[in-house]
Amino acid sequence: MEGDGMSATDKIKEADWRLFRSRLPIWQEAYMERLNREYIALLSGTGPASEKFWELERRMREDKRRGGVVMRMSRSNMELNLLSLLSDGVISIAELDGFSEELREKLALVLRDHRDWDHGNS
């Protein structure tokens, strides 16, 4: 990147950027639907109402910060955003079908390296 005259955004393919912008709202809606089902299960469970209330409040506070709920849309952050969606379980690698092979391979490599790092394997 340094010295090659290209910025990070120049390396993002236009087709990948358009696909990301079109799929992100769909992925977010599906993720929030999943969260709503989890919240309903939490509230419908056994236990004191106060415990369920405070657990729901804690979960919502954490969940609303995830990329599946809110995400800063910028071309320069697209790859990091996709990694966040993948690592948070909002989407799977299979849902990257249609993106460029180069991008999918790059994300898979980073995720594999991250898993190796988390498990102490180098």
Residue ranges and their predicted role:
Residues 2-122:
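Acidic, Ser/Pro/Thr-rich low-complexity regulatory regions
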